[in-house]
Amino acid sequence: MHTGEEMSKDFNIEIEYKHVPRLDAGSDESISYLDEHGYVVIKNALSTEEAKKTLDLLWDYLEALGTGIDRNNPNTWDDDKWPTCAHGGIMPSYGIGHSEAQWFLRGIPNVKKAFAKIWDTDELLTSFDGVSLWRPWNLNSEWKTESGQAWFHIDQHPISKPGKQCIQGLVNLLPTSEE
């Protein structure tokens, strides 16, 4: 596992780990933070029920691919059944951008509220990129994404290209840790 210092050397960046405030969707404070830092973390963007439903819809999508994936059987999550993903988890293909899970997620009130405040309109347009689906590496060490890989990215860097030209959202549906 790379340390922040090693990643700095690999990518010529400085990584600072710090507490980041969680702000209300659609609040003036969230927009001020976004303007100042280039990102914002929205607290309670999804309820527990909305996160669970989104996750269930993603599993429905994966099982409907017809490759033999079964959400209840991790033995079916191997590469021969799992959709091809970039960097171990980024899935931009297979119609995932138009999946029921993605449309459900885009329609969640706090998600819409956050973007409506950013763009100062309720008339929102969306792109149809992909999703990132990482399998639990504690079940198979080959599924682990090593720190320092370029899997996690943003399309608009807040320092080299400031302003609001390409605002992306990221939603964790399961608990995460620094590991």
Task: Place the predicted regions along the sequence by residue.
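Short hydrophobic-aromatic micro-motifs
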Residues: 41-42, 171
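Intrinsically disordered, low-complexity acidic/polar segments
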Residues: 51, 178-179
